[in-house]
Curated annotation (Swiss-Prot):
Residues 75-87, 144-163, 225-249, 324-354, 406-429, 487-498 are extracellular. This is Sucrose transport protein SUT5. It is a multi-pass membrane protein. GO terms for biological process: maltose transport; sucrose metabolic process; sucrose transport. Pathway: Glycan biosynthesis; sucrose metabolism. Keywords: Cell membrane, Membrane, Sugar transport, Symport, Transmembrane, Transmembrane helix, Transport. Residues 1-53, 109-122, 185-203, 271-302, 376-384, 451-465, 520-535 are cytoplasmic. It comes from Oryza sativa subsp. japonica (Rice).
Length: 535
């Protein structure tokens, strides 16, 4: 749900679970020998050429993140145009945490043991990217497919009712997209760790991975904010797919293009060393052994770790409403649009969604800048103080969003033509500032919890895999809770997104207090930890 949800999103996918499974020492020696030459093993290659090749070998991370940014910014609003009620949009996102919890560990287990000639990671990256391309095309053409499956034949410019066949096609594509994203993310990050060992070190590899994710996020949100796709490519519009839908198609077409190009570059430059069959660790009990080992390890966790898990869970309870409803809030509460209203109201809503995508771009920039100063802040203030401050900031920003939404909707009547003149400029500016500022605590969300968990488990003799594995449980469970309850709560109050944001703000305040009281004093945040939290 991401960065997360960017990305939301590595936080919920637990890319580091591959550390729970091991290979023999001979494999590690081969990997170091490979890295001591170059990415492809050429010992004569200059250091500059090695780092450039390593940089482009990770290009697939940018392509995947581009598509993920589109998913975060556009798909909740788009699903409502197909007839999925605002109260049940959250249920379409329930696959994300499930996929992150189940798919990534299993893919990590088998990618550690893959003996194909093309390497351990690239087969999974290839298959995952192909499924992503198919999934986004299913989503983009869901309205057209639904029309052929029995939805209304009335033109989309006049029809305002539900299109259930299209909605079902959309959900299938959405869920496949979530599973495919998790298939690619773990092996791609693990491959960077493999290729950067030796000359460069894991921090360099993970920093490159993070940079590509940032590039993908910025380009993805720019694409989502663009409302000209239907003008540049008029053939995207059909009787079932009007301007907003055509813009979604255009954005996803570019996603397919970028994913194919970035995947091709990665497949060519990431010259992995094949794993010999005799080097495969066969002592485990298959992919399910990952879960068995994880839950067994819970019994041996240090007491401080349970407090870290509790604070992490409450933190994610506060974040998921924003991750899910950000652009919808801009389209509804600020722009006064309706996804299933008249053509004019739908256009206003679409304009608000695109403005929200621009706000998420500002959020990504703030996140990237903040990530560089987090290690220094943690060393100066301790990690728990930084974590606590970030939660109080989320509380303040959620409160502002609730207040701005209520002021914007005060006296508003959907039947009034004044609602079509656009949002209040001051309120729109405040909303964009909130979107930008929320990138600051989001940088903490994607780094500090992982660093604290790693330090606590390391003090007790645990490893990174243990830390990330158990922390993933504390991330998945609250996401499931919010996904199951946020929409129905909004529907019960009939207040749009305001109740979810209010609840999120309350959890953020509680978590700010708990972080100060419960968390141990730690100060270290490595570069790898900064990008481990995901998107």
């Amino acid at each position: 749900m991401e960065e997360g949800r960017r990305g939301d999103r590595e936080g919920k996918s637990a890319a580091g679970w591959t550390a729970l499974s091991t290979t023999k020492t001979t494999l590690e020696e081969k990997r170091r020998l490979q890295a001591n030459g170059s990415v492809g093993g050429d010992a004569g290659t200059s250091g500059f050429r090695r780092i450039v090749r390593l940089f482009f070998a990770c290009m697939v991370a940018g392509g995947i993140q581009y598509g993920w940014a589109l998913q975060l910014s556009l798909l909740s609003p788009y699903s409502q145009t197909l007839g999925i009620s605002h109260s049940y949009v959250s249920l379409t996102w329930i696959c994300g945490p499930i996929a992150g919890f189940v798919v990534q560990p299993i893919v990590g287990y088998y990618s550690d043991r893959c003996t194909m000639k093309m390497g351990r990671r690239r087969p999974f990256i290839l298959v995952g990217c192909l499924i992503i391309c198919i999934s986004v095309m299913i989503i983009g053409f869901s309205a057209d497919i639904g029309r052929h499956l029995g939805d209304t034949k009335e033109h989309c410019s006049t029809y305002t009712g539900p299109r259930w066949s299209a909605a079902m096609v959309y959900i299938v594509g959405f869920w496949f997209l979530d599973f495919a994203n998790n298939t690619v993310q773990g092996p791609a990050r693990a491959m960077m760790a493999d290729l950067s060992a030796g000359h460069h070190g894991p921090n360099v590899g993970q920093s490159i991975f993070s940079l590509w994710m940032a590039i993908g996020s910025v380009l993805g949100y720019l694409s989502g904010a663009n409302g000209k796709w239907h003008e540049w490519f008029p053939w995207l519009k059909t009787a079932a797919c009007c301007d907003a839908c055509a813009n979604l198609k255009g954005a996803f077409f570019t996603a397919v293009l970028l994913i194919v190009v970035s995947m091709t570059v990665t497949m060519y430059l990431a010259d992995e060393m094949p794993l010999d069959k005799q080097d495969v660790d066969t002592s485990g009990g298959g992919g399910c052994a990952v879960f068995v080992d994880l839950f067994k390890s819970l019994r041996n966790l240090p007491p401080a770790m349970f407090k870290v898990l509790a604070v992490t869970a409450v933190t994610w309870l506060s974040w998921f409403p924003f991750i899910q409803y950000n652009t919808d809030w801009m389209g509804r509460e600020i722009y006064h649009g309706e996804p299933q209203g008249t053509a004019a109201k739908a256009d206003v809503y679409d304009a608000g969604v695109r403005e929200g995508a621009m706000g998420l771009l500002f959020c990504s920039v703030a996140l990237g800048v903040t990530s560089f100063v987090i290690p220094k802040l943690c060393r100066r203030l301790t990690s728990k103080v930084v974590w606590s401050i970030s939660n109080f900031l989320v509380f303040a920003l959620m409160a502002v969003m609730v207040a701005v939404g209520m002021v914007s909707m005060r006296g508003y009547r959907p039947s009034l033509a004044a609602g079509l003149t656009g949002p209040d400029p001051t309120l729109k500016a405040v909303a964009l500032v909130v979107f930008a500022l929320i990138g600051i605590p989001q940088a903490v969300l994607f780094s500090v919890p992982w660093a604290v968990a790693s330090e606590v488990t390391a003090e007790e003799g645990g490893g990174q895999g243990l830390a990330i594995g158990v922390l993933n449980i504390a991330i998945v469970v609250p996401q499931l809770v919010i996904a199951l309850t946020a929409g129905p709560i909004d529907g019960a109050f009939n207040k749009g997104n305001t109740p979810a944001f209010g609840i999120g703000g309350a959890f953020a305040f509680i978590c700010g207090v708990l972080a100060l009281i419960w968390l141990p004093k730690t100060r270290g945040v490595s570069n790898a930890a900064v990008v481990a939290g995901g998107h």
